[in-house]
Amino acid sequence: MAPSTLICDTDSWQNLKTHVAEIKKTHLRDLMSDADRCKSMMVEFDGLLLDYSRQNATHDTMSKLFQLAEASHLKDKINQMFNGEHINSTENRSVLHVALRASRDAVINGDGKNVVPDVWQVLDKIRDFSEKIRSGSWVGVTGKPLTNVVAVGIGGSFLGPLFVHTALQTESEAAECAKGRQLRFLANVDPIDVAKNISGLNPETTLVVVVSKTFTTAETMLNARTLREWISSALGPAAVAKHMVAVSTNLTLVEKFGIDPKNAFAFWDWVGGRYSVCSAVGVLPLSLQYGFPIVEKFLKGASSIDQHFHSAPLEKNLPVLLGLLSLWNVSFLGHPARAILPYCQALEKFAPHIQQVSMESNGKGVSIDGVVLPFEAGEIDFGEPGTNGQHSFYQLIHQGRVIPCDFIGIAKSQQPVYLKGEVVSNHDELMSNFFAQPDALAYGKTQEELQKENISPHLVPHKTFTGNRPSLSLLLPSLTAYNVGQLLAIYEHRVAVEGFVWGINSFDQWGVELGKSLANQVRKQLHASRTNGEAVKGFNFSTTTVMAKYLQETSDVPAELPTKLP
């Protein structure tokens, strides 16, 4: 396929478009009655079981999707990523987050150099530093151990590490390693977030990790300056060097900020923010909380999926299957949204993280060559742990819009609870819903079935479920650090597969720039209005009116800002 050719112009794409009419004649009630079909749509790898039999798909559908993958040169693109080629073409960068969790003896080249030794140099530095903090050999300026960590970052510097932290908090081995310690994440520039994160913390026992590649991210640096003031006002300016460290590549600005450059932990241009949880961005705060050995298990889990993604045939490749099925639902069946439904409270921050990974990666309107797409790429991701979501938005999923669902279940609970006299354990009660919901969506309930139950005729339309609503189920054996790493990598690569087939660049994010540049203009106006009383000007009528109202309501804010902390 020539570089300028869009995937929608290929025979494979057109064959799938034609195939849609055939699929719309089917119903999952009938498709699910074919045991051979269902068996062929189950894939196991390293303890994980994927069941995609409840997708609106037949053997022919899958064959055509694999042909589409071939037409898009999916295997070649996967190899290009692992080989360090500059597949992020708009920024002329490699995409090598797989190197972040590679084994020490692996060889992964970027710009003609094996990057794995550099990765492990940083990992070893994190191991040593986190052990010093956790053992108490590195103490704060007053001699007290640093038992509290506040990680300051935003976007990928926050959502990924928070997901992993939340997933590990209730895992027995990780929880034991974290006893007596706290890890918090400060992301929002809203001062309320600052107040919440320092509430109850003692500066004497707190270490702040500032995460910013360039050390210029506006929100992160304002929050960092706020916490620097919180520390220095309590302990003196010299305390900053003992109580603040950085994850950054801009050592000049790190030192200017007051942090010893020796306490800066590097990452690289080939690591995108939303793919950075396995870099120092996530590994440092997580190692401070749980110890490096726990985090290393997480990295090994991710690495196992990396190797599977790179080497498994498409028909047995978990991320490839998930990516192709998402693309089938979005681009052919017309379902733009996806619900991520983990039946595990420890995964409550998983959907928000994948929301960023997916929507920032694939929310693009042009091809990698800059050609406007005649189809919509990307999907709208949202989710909530089960069973909470059942009492929130499942009504729409069952009887409103068709939204493909990912059900994620854990065989062994992190916190098993049994009550004498109960029919099942608490976890079995949870998993009863995990198994029931996909079938409810697939089969639905017909008017005939309701009439046999003697339902009042006027209620029959309201209690009818059309069914034929697609989902897939992913069952993990447990939720250890290793399994968390597996889950992360599956979804990272799933997103890449979609982008590779759509022919877009999943590794840039120019869409976040325009709003930031406009915010700079607003910031200047607010400053001028506060200090000089200048009227709001240079904006459209609506913005001018609302900004003037805002300034009026906050006229008590002093022109020269004194220091005021929560």
From Swiss-Prot:
Reaction(s) this enzyme catalyzes, per UniProt: alpha-D-glucose 6-phosphate = beta-D-fructose 6-phosphate
Cellular compartments annotated: Cytoplasm
Entry GO MF terms: carbohydrate derivative binding; glucose-6-phosphate isomerase activity; monosaccharide binding
Main location: cytoplasm
GO cellular component, one term: cytosol
Disulphide bridges, residue numbers: none
Associated pathway: Carbohydrate degradation; glycolysis; D-glyceraldehyde 3-phosphate and glycerone phosphate from D-glucose: step 2/4
Membrane spanning residue stretches: none
Class of the enzyme per the UniProt entry, highest EC level: isomerase
Matching InterPro entries: G6P_Isomerase, G6P_Isomerase_C, Phosphoglucose_isomerase_CS, SIS_dom_sf, SIS_PGI_1, SIS_PGI_2
Keywords on record: Cytoplasm, Gluconeogenesis, Glycolysis, Isomerase
SUPFAM superfamilies linked: SIS domain (SSF53697)
A GO BP annotation: glucose 6-phosphate metabolic process
Family annotation (HAMAP family): G6P_isomerase (MF_00473)
Entry's family note: Belongs to the GPI family.
Protein name: Glucose-6-phosphate isomerase, cytosolic
Source organism: Spinacia oleracea (Spinach)
Gene name as annotated: PGIC
